[in-house]
Amino acid sequence: MGSIKIPIETSARHIHISREDFEKLFGEGKELTFVKELSQPGQYLAKERVTIAGPRGTFENVAILGPFRKETQVELSLTDTRKIGVAGVIRQSGDVADTPGCKLIAGDRELEIERGVIVAKRHIHMTPGDAVKMRLKDNEEVFVITQSFDRALIYANVVVRISWDYRLSMHVDTDEANAFASDVAPTGAILKLFDGQTYSLQQWADEIQSGINR
């Protein structure tokens, strides 16, 4: 069986917001206004927008993605973090401990969040069925080679996230997408060893260490 093609999607800067923070910015009792579904089941683009402000700059008209989250999370690229003057901390979604904060602005309302600004670690969403086919485990890290134009890249540290609520796709930010000259519908494939096993970071590290020890 050949390699499974994984759709690669580019995530521009956006925010996941808690109900409490949303009401502080848009008014008590207000709800997110649905605009369109996203590729992952249950996720959607909302009509409401915010401005993100840091010590050195701002980004206006930043998209909010629904539904509400337990805690507000702002996802930027490393280039974005440098532009507004906040530390670029690479994390998996939901892991916001010890991350920088920023100011959120909606009209004449402002809210300072103490943490929650992250650079999302590149990752693949897949179902348990996909994982069985590719012989992968949740939170395993793999190599993915992109298939796009004449600037294909091999990405390491790609986290596998498995749930029946997911649809197969790899998510990268705008910095990463620009690096491999993303086309209209880019795809990637998980690299395999010669025996057909998934080429994981641990296997790669073990092979290097084995070579050093020879």
Regions found by a protein language model. Name each.
Residues 203-214:
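Helix-rich terminal scaffold detector
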Residues 43-45, 198-202:
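Short, solvent-exposed polar/charged micro-motifs at secondary-structure junctions
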Residues 7-55, 60-107, 112-145, 156-188:
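Short beta-strand-centered segments at strand-helix junctions
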Residues 110, 148-151, 194-198:
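Short, charged beta-turn/beta-strand-edge "cap" motif at the junction between a beta-strand
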Residues 1-6, 213-214:
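Generic N-terminal segment detector
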Residues 179-200, 207:
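Mixed-charge, glycine-accented linear interaction segment located at domain edges/termini
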Residues 155-156, 201:
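Short, well-ordered secondary-structure micro-motifs
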